Amino acid sequence: MSNRVIIFDTTLRDGEQALAASLSVKEKLQIAMALERLGVDVMEVGFPVSSPGDFESVQTIARTIKNSRVCALSRALEKDIDAAAQALSVADQFRIHTFISTSTIHVESKLKRSFDQVLEMAVGAVKYARRFTDDVEFSCEDAGRTPIDNLCRMVEAAILAGARTINIPDTVGYTVPSEFGNIIQTLFNRVPNIDQAVISVHCHDDLGLSVANSITAVQHGARQIECTINGIGERAGNCSLEEIAMILATRKGMLGLETGINAKEIHRTSNLVSQLCNMPVQANKAIVGANAFTHSSGIHQDGMLKAQNTYEIMTPESIGLNRNNLNMTSRSGRHVIKHRMEEMGYSEHDYNMDTLYEEFLKLADKKGQVFDYDLEALAFMEAQAEEDNHYQLQQLVVQSDSTEGVATATVRIEVGGEIKTEAATGNGPVDAAYNAIARATDRRIDIISYKLGAKGVGQNALGQVDITAVYHEQNFHGVGLATDVVEASARALVHVMNLTCRADKVADYKQSMQKNRELGGV
């Protein structure tokens, strides 16, 4: 048996079913091209019979993608198969994926037929699909709850009819790994023509076991895993592609299996899908979460500085990230602070480590995470260790035109002790407020991230806005709290403005320090 596991991505079909709004054809094509770069073997990109829009997107992707096999879904109905075949006909290579329910509850309650009738429909659908392509996949929907005798009969009949891939879905995420592995093993033991098809699995995450079930399945002989980027999909989602790829890569010595995935594209693809689907990735998500390669414990950070594999079983570079993160918090030791200062180009002779660490702990206790620009200010600006409020927002007034979408904001802001008042328009109240603040401060920054949340519960909750902005190629993080979201946004921007002002002062100090070094060396 081959040790190569086929990766079948269904982000654009099953994954899209989780979205509040459908993706456009252009957005689907962007994701499809990213999946091709990622190296998926098969991409299921839609259900052509469901709508003209789905038909168009499947056809557009089929015409464009060259290095992955494009697949479309169809029920075990001729009209569905016709639509799939027509949409896919422009592709160099394609697969038709047809399915029917096989569990007792589905057969009796949903289809209202006998199992023998359903088996006959399945065989007919596979034979009909084979008129258009040799690459036909058949799925036994809700296989995880199908009586094993019926499942064996269905699989044998579908293979005999011409299916070259047989998919065993745990449609409702019901099984546990030992149970699901036993289903796959039983099929291999009891279906006489099983060697004529690739056994695939499609596991849902209702009990959080989709990845575990999929890995167990390939240990028992399955050689295709159906999955999605970031695990998005119906209800609790699908098996996560990035987790499967990195499990098989990281534990290759134990599992003896491999994929064709270009892991260095994982992070980029995950970000693209998250942005286009408007589905943020949870911070603690395996492989692609913001905290996946972040270390805050002082003990862990110490180990990481001595040897990276003490607390990392894979490198961030392996999925396309530049490096891991050692978050500077009150749990960070002196060695981490020294390491960060060295990375920023400072020798231990440039600052007093005892004083710096003492001030660092005070600031970390107050604000949680300390950033590089905070550390520099603590090291070289003693009196400015607290945030330098060069800018202070005194008043914000916003007027919006609900019909035109244009807003006007007027700000009164203190700039180095001088009161300035400016007004500006914008595409909405937040944009107008930002434009007015930029005029008043004459300081331009680029906002690359804006997150809106709440602090507190119920009527007493405050709006919290977190922004990340770029200034002189460095990222700065600002937070604003207020009962009004627009005011919270303005306060977050002013917070960033003050951080950049302080960074300018640190830069001036560094420049003078460098000049003194040069003069001392003459």
Swiss-Prot record:
EC number(s) stated in the UniProt entry for this protein: 2.3.3.13
Keywords on record: Amino-acid biosynthesis, Branched-chain amino acid biosynthesis, Cytoplasm, Leucine biosynthesis, Manganese, Metal-binding, Transferase
Gene3D superfamilies named in the record: 1.10.238.260, 3.30.160.270, Aldolase class I
Domain of life: Bacteria
Chain residue ranges for the region called Regulatory domain: 392-522
One GO MF term attached to the UniProt entry: manganese ion binding
Pathway: Amino-acid biosynthesis; L-leucine biosynthesis; L-leucine from 3-methyl-2-oxobutanoate: step 1/4
Self-association state and partner proteins as the record states: Homodimer.
Name of this chain's protein: 2-isopropylmalate synthase
Gene that encodes it: leuA
